[in-house]
Design a protein with these regions (language model features):
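Alpha-helical transmembrane segments and membrane-interface helix-loop junctions
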Residues: 1-189
Length: 189
């Protein structure tokens, strides 16, 4: 964490005197934003798949009295992939939940400072979550872990998607931090 903060501070200090951020940071922000937007726009249609799965569950269980074993796990896997892979996209579009007790009264620069400050906590949390996801995925693959249900699906596919989603959110958190730093310094990305 200290290494990451040191890198960020160095990048802030080397901001050129012109009106834009360093090319490396600008390219990083544009690249990560484009990836998260593409992934988010694809994943947002997963909610329709989840609705189909749940309607199918209702139909098979209540109408034809033939409950399917795999339906609940499939809905859980779908919603997990949906919110984790869509996390970076919701950060870009600013659609995440925010406590607006003081934030709404701040100036644009003040909001950027507040966002940069809170981004540090988010980045710290996501780094720990990312590390935990890696070790969890390694364990899952080594032990060929399955769920203890009648369907008994392997867990590694959803844990892989979780790892990718957490990584995208972490990369997007850095992108948002760089954008906030640019706002604080009145620079363009």
């Amino acid at each position: 964490m200290i290494l990451i903060l040191a890198i960020i501070l160095i990048l802030i200090l080397i901001v050129p005197k012109n009106n834009s951020m360093p090319k490396l940071i600008s390219n990083y922000v544009k690249f990560i934003d484009s990836i998260c937007i593409k992934v988010g726009r694809i994943v947002m249609y997963g909610v329709f798949f989840m609705m189909f799965v749940l309607i199918l569950s209702f139909f098979t269980r209540n109408i034809i009295n033939y409950p399917l074993m795999w339906i609940i796990e499939m809905a859980q896997f779908t919603i997990t992939a949906y919110y984790l892979l869509g996390g970076g996209y919701s950060m870009i579009t600013d659609d995440h939940v925010r406590m607006d007790l003081f934030y709404g009264r701040l100036s644009e620069r003040g909001k950027a400072k507040m966002d940069a400050f809170t981004s540090m906590f988010l980045i710290f949390y996501l780094i720990i979550l990312f590390y935990g996801s890696i070790t969890s995925l390694q364990y899952t693959i080594q032990t060929k872990q399955k769920l203890f249900t009648a369907w008994a699906p392997y867990v590694w596919p959803i844990k892989s998607l979780m790892l990718i989603g957490i990584l995208l959110m972490l990369l997007q958190a850095f992108s948002m931090l760089f954008k906030d730093i640019a706002k604080m310094k009145n620079k363009k990305i």
